[in-house]
Amino acid sequence: MEKAIQRQRVLLEHLQPIRHHTHDHSSSLTTSICAAGDSAAYQRTAAFGDDVVIVAAYRTAICKSKRGGFKDTLSDDLLAPVLKAVIEKTNLDPKEVGDIVVGTVLAPGSIRAMECRMAAFYAGFPETVPIRTVNRQCSSGLQAVADVAASIKAGFYDIGIGAGLELMTVDNIGRVQQRNTKVDTFAQARDCLLPMGITSENVAQRFGVTRLEQDQAAVNSHQRAAAATASGKFKDEIIPVLTKIVDPQTGKEKPVVISVDDGIRPNTNLTSLGKLKPAFKNDGTTTAGNASQVSDGAAAVLLMKRSVAMKKGLPILGVFRSFAAVGVDPAVMGIGPAVAIPPAVKSAGLDLDDIDLYEINEAFASQFVYCQKKLNLDPEKVNVNGGAMALGHPLGATGARCVATLLHEMKRRGKDCRFGVISMCIGSGMGAAAVFERGDAVDDLCNARVSNNNSFLSKDAK
């Protein structure tokens, strides 16, 4: 933490107006290092009110596709409750929202865009509030949040919503229908068409991730998710959804309220997982038990300028600090987080040691284990409430879901947890990561403004 404070002190000196004093030019932190790294960065400023902050982040429960709680729910009815929640729970006038961006993957783009627009109307938004979708596959929900943060930072609007939605009960993972003959002459293009399970096997084989390591990761995920559920942690982030369940035999509809993740198996153990056969290769190590679940779910995140949140008296859940998207070899797309996290952390002016919590999507245990080992992460900081192997992975919603899970956990931990990272691999060979700061983690070295009446920095300066 001392290193982080020193970096922030030097950073603020770079960003302050020129004064008649000098600072230590021998510092290892320079303006070039402070600037955004690689291809993506989120510039800090010394203007306290210029921070992009999160004031609300909620999700639905995550349910098993085709047989879970949302199997008979329409996509627009799944998205509407979380859009409504971020407005109602903050008492925000919906007409003040500048844009809504929804990450979504599998449904045809134009159809899903209309469904999202319909959901906004159900949630109480007026016709004047626009909405669009974004698709960067498994990172789509996080990309939506990053897009809104960037738009607020650019001054396009002051308030926006980044959301995510996937109804895998209805929208199945598709395949390219008309294969281009050129693809066989471009190895990486060909590998974009590999089934995700085969890329998992490639990671396990290339980097020596064993079946036992993968199964143990799955056990840990289920145990942590079960413990979080039992302790009531997820109640802070889950919005109950009133929907229906249709009896497949009689067709009779039964009204239900879905408020608990239904994919968690508390009794998962190495013995039971060890009996499962490989799902993609006869001699493989990836099984139905150590891969993410196919799921239905939605999530929404309300972002705004800090100055707007302060004016409205809204509590600040988190601060959006940086974002990075990177490309990797499509044949081992699962390594994406190991490549994306370092530049995202660097862009925030931090080191990996400064990060207190991680939410890394568990697309497959093979890639999850590899990324932890590659970055030498403390397992006690990663997916402390379980991940996609236990909760499920509704593709477009996962990134936004992780924002809700991470920020509520950081809030619970308080002063001992300042910075958090969300990351995931992306089909066709990419990775994405974002850095967040706990909302109340402000001091004279962070998010401060220069007081005109005093010679010191104060977060309360006018």
Swiss-Prot record:
Transit peptide (first-last residue): 1-34
InterPro entries the UniProt entry points to: Thiolase (IPR002155), Thiolase-like (IPR016039), Thiolase-like_sf_Thiolase (IPR050215), Thiolase_acyl_enz_int_AS (IPR020615), Thiolase_AS (IPR020610), Thiolase_C (IPR020617), Thiolase_CS (IPR020613), Thiolase_N (IPR020616)
CDD domains with a match to the protein in the record: thiolase
Main location: other
Keywords: Acyltransferase, Peroxisome, Transferase, Transit peptide
Pathway stated in the Swiss-Prot or TrEMBL entry: Aromatic compound metabolism; Lipid metabolism; fatty acid metabolism
Alphabetical list of Gene3D superfamilies matching this protein: 3.40.47.10
GO BP annotation list: fatty acid beta-oxidation; green leaf volatile biosynthetic process; phenylacetate catabolic process
GO-annotated cellular components: peroxisome
One Pfam entry name: Thiolase_N
Keyword Nucleotide-binding on entry: no
Subcellular compartments: Peroxisome
Free-text disruption phenotype from the record: Strongly reduced benzoic acid (BA) levels and lower benzenoid formation.
UniProt-listed Enzyme Commission number(s): 2.3.1.16
Catalysed reaction equations from the record: an acyl-CoA + acetyl-CoA = a 3-oxoacyl-CoA + CoA
A molecular function (GO) term: acetyl-CoA C-acyltransferase activity
Residue positions of the active site: C138 (acyl-thioester intermediate), H393 (proton acceptor), C425 (proton acceptor)
Group of enzyme by EC: transferase
Record-listed substrate binding positions: G427
Family indicated by similarity: Belongs to the thiolase-like superfamily. Thiolase family.
Function: Component of the floral volatile benzenoid/phenylpropanoid (FVBP) biosynthetic pathway. Thiolase that catalyzes the conversion of 3-oxo-3-phenylpropionyl-CoA (benzoylacetyl-CoA) to benzoyl-CoA.
Assembly with partners or alone: Homodimer.
Protein name: 3-ketoacyl CoA thiolase 1, peroxisomal
Species whose genome carries this gene: Petunia hybrida (Petunia)
